[in-house]
Amino acid sequence: MTDKLRTAFDAQENACDMLGSPLTRDVVGLCHENFNRGGIIAKLVRGWQGDPLNDNVPLRLAGFAHYQALSGDENLARFYESCGGLYQAADRPDLAIALDGVFQREEAAARRFLRSAPQTNETGRAAMLLLGFSEVSKRLGLPLRLREMGASAGLNLFFDQFHYRLAMD
């Protein structure tokens, strides 16, 4: 099982690198290092019952870290753009400390979180919603109320709470 977990970590790190997601790549990589040292991550995933690659164990760990940042963990939030933070490669040692701390402090919550597969819908698509809904609001002059019926589990209902970077000519 240890080899399968290492393979899952390697695969996810590579995918994040190819997709240009340095923060998630480093979160997964630091969890991988912690696992290899026998730290809290090894304790959390020891005895995993399924296939760690198919079950997206590394993404579950990364998802928990992001969830904690969104829930107000200031030590992690400072790295996540979705929380108004910024991550740079030089921050990796501080990120390692923050990750170890949150997994240690929130071990029970992490165990509960790891039971569920991650929601992997791409919320970046919400940028188009922001533009479209801004135009609708401008034209109608009315407040916008939304309901989402579909596969994204309401993620796009929060389009106004995401952080956007727009390129301007």
Name what the model sees in each region.
Residues M1-R145, S152-D169:
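Rossmann-like AdoMet
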